Amino acid sequence: MANTDPISDMLTRIRNACEKRHQTTNIPLSRMNRSIAKVLEQEGFIDQFSEAGEGVQKHLVLSLKYSGKQKVPTIRSVQRVSKPGLRIYTNRRDLPKVLGGLGVAIISTSKGVMSDRDARKEGVGGEVLCYVY
């Protein structure tokens, strides 16, 4: 079956893996998913990611990050904002701040996928893909 929204699929896999306290999770490989994983790694929400598999079966392996003895997930919430049925765009002046700057909005811009902080520095707006905090 074809996946109509691979970004939502990625975020759901991350959310489910965090709830079950898994160390890693597998996500189908795409350029967009790789870019989102890179932003999550740069912002400190995941330890690392790598590519595995061959051909059509290639996927990303994300190492999730936890803190403390009780393994509290670093990613507390992941919300999809712009969806295939309703795209949400923002200009550089109206870039959202998630939880007063504690969270991250992941933005797809003309200069690539980046966090809201990087988009402010670059002075670009774009499609708001998701919020992570």
UniProtKB/Swiss-Prot annotation:
Which Pfam families does the record cross-reference, listed alphabetically? Ribosomal_S8
PROSITE patterns, from UniProt? RIBOSOMAL_S8 (PS00053)
List GO BP terms, alphabetically.
translation
* Keyword Cytoplasm belongs to the record: no
Keywords (A to Z) from UniProt = Ribonucleoprotein, Ribosomal protein, RNA-binding, rRNA-binding
One cellular component term (GO) for this entry is: ribonucleoprotein complex
Q: What is this protein called?
A: Small ribosomal subunit protein uS8
| Species annotation | Synechococcus sp. (strain RCC307)
The UniProt gene name for this protein comes to rpsH
